[in-house]
Every structure is written in structure tokens, then in C-alpha cells.
Amino acid sequence: GVQGKAPNPYWDPLQWMIEQCHKRGMELHAWINPYRAKTKGTSALAKNHVVNLHPSRVFDYDGQLILNPGLAENRKYICDVVADIVARYDIDGLHIDDYFYPYPSPGHEIPDAQQYKQYSNGINDINDWRRYNVNLYMQAMQETIKAIKPWVKFGVSPFGSCRNKKNSQIGSETNGL
């Protein structure tokens, strides 16, 4: 297929999956990757893609384009997309992956210092500010889903342990990022 174009003949894979799951007594949880706007392997983006419409709202990080989590308009945009999914489809749950900032990549810094300076809300540490943005997003996502269909489950795929002994005395005995 081509991004931004409906398949011909038209069919809706999410609707089809919901029907097939429900016929079999199974739940269907839609799974999205909210901040990742373009992966390394993506070559062409539709003209109406958020990256083309609002290039200042994304940053390049290690070859990927990421919707900047520090911008309130990006949190709202993602919540609007989720609201559309929840309203239009009979999903049983919505699951998000990579709901946080990009994983560390050697030699790359997350280019959000300008947004931190502008929107820090008095938070003195950029990493605390990033966690604050994630918390704002989680709350907005939960409220968005529950306002439309309170019974729809909301799930998150967190990444391991947030701290380990190699970077914090109070961390876990793990060796993850």
C-alpha cells in the first residue's frame, strides 16, 4: 500500500480483526506507537502526515523522527488520534508502546533543550521534566479513552527498570538502559 491512500478495493484491517476476534470470544486491543513519526526504514510520507504538516513539532533522533513529547500540541494530537480510534471502533482495549522519550543511543542527545527552557514549569532537571511530560501524557490518554468509552482498557508497555545499580545507588540489580 501507499501511506495516505485507502486500499483498493477498500477494506479496513482493524475492523476485520475486531470482527474476527469477537466472533471467537476474544478481545481486540489496538496497539499504537504514539511518538514515533518516522522510522529509519520508512522512505515516503503522505502529504498530510504530521511530519509534513508540522515539521517543527518533531525532532530527528538517530535517524528516526519523533513527535516531541515536551510539546502540549503533540500530546493533544496523539490523544485526538486515540479518540478517533476509540470512537470509531469496537475495541476492547488500547495499548501503547514507547510512550516515553527515545532510548539512549551512543553519540546522540535528545534535542529538546529549547522546549525544556521554554516549558520547564520550574522543574530543575531535564530528566525530571521529561518524566513530568510522560505523566501529563498518560493522564491525558486515560482521560481521553474513558471520556468516550469508560469500559475500554488502557495498557502500557513499559521498558524494564527505570534505574539500575550502574546509574543509581537505589537502582535494581539489572543491567538495562
List the model feature ranges, each with a label:
Residues 1, 36-62, 98-122, 167:
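Aromatic- and acidic-residue-enriched segments that line the glycan-binding/catalytic groove
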Residues 1-33, 121-148:
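Aromatic-lined substrate-binding rim segments of carbohydrate-active enzymes
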Residues 4-19, 29-88:
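Active-site-adjacent "subsite" loops/lids of carbohydrate-active enzymes
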Residues 73-177:
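Active-site neighborhood of glycoside hydrolase catalytic domains
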